[in-house]
From Swiss-Prot:
This is Large ribosomal subunit protein uL5. GO terms for biological process: translation. The gene is rplE. Belongs to the universal ribosomal protein uL5 family. This is one of the proteins that bind and probably mediate the attachment of the 5S RNA into the large ribosomal subunit, where it forms part of the central protuberance. In the 70S ribosome it contacts protein S13 of the 30S subunit (bridge B1b), connecting the 2 subunits; this bridge is implicated in subunit movement. Contacts the P site tRNA; the 5S rRNA and some of its associated proteins might help stabilize positioning of ribosome-bound tRNAs.
Length: 179
């Protein structure tokens, strides 16, 4: 079992029950899934760029990403319908907890001038979004073998009803919020 899953059951759940006064442990918010999305606009000009992005995301997530395509043509961006424009991965269960563990303990501290992540990036429904500017903060990516620095978006979907509950949940997972 993943280290953070045990930590959630033994430490986070009792703390949240005490903090918010839930009547049942099933009411306690939990992390449902983590979605990693990498938009690759440069893939229009060069198809190799998409292959590199897919392989980078596969190394980071430990699972093969799905290539996302444009829903409609946009002449200004030189995009046609069904052109590949990015890739995404949805992590659940143990892989999700393993990724969260690596993100909190290894990847985020490797960000240059890191002072914590914003506490304002909640969507109003208990989900958290954050962007990573460079994929090289993850130890799985070898600096010598990358073709370009690419950022990615990380969405943490929780069952929390409010942003306050979601922030408390992530804070108990030792998520490094500013201030």
């Amino acid at each position: 079992m993943a280290r953070l899953r045990e930590f959630y059951k033994e430490t986070v759940v009792p703390e949240l029950v005490k903090q918010f006064g839930y009547k049942s442990v099933m009411e306690v918010p939990r992390i449902e899934k983590i979605t990693l999305n990498m938009g690759v606009g440069e893939a229009i000009a060069d198809k190799k760029v998409m292959e590199h992005a897919v392989s980078d995301l596969e190394k980071i997530a430990g699972q093969k990403p799905v290539v996302t395509v444009a829903r409609k043509s946009i002449a200004g961006f030189k995009i046609r319908d069904n052109y590949p424009v990015g890739c995404k991965v949805t992590l659940r269960r143990d892989q999700m907890f393993e990724f969260l563990d690596r993100l909190i303990t290894i990847a985020l501290p490797r960000v240059r001038d890191f002072r914590g992540v914003s506490g304002k990036s909640f969507d109003g429904r208990g989900n958290y979004n954050m962007g990573v500017r460079e994929q090289i903060i993850f130890p799985e990516i070898e600096y010598d073998k990358i073709d370009a620095l690419r950022g990615l978006n990380i969405t943490i979907t929780t069952t929390a009803k409010t942003d306050e509950e979601a922030k408390a949940l992530l804070s108990l997972f030792k998520f490094p919020f500013k201030g």
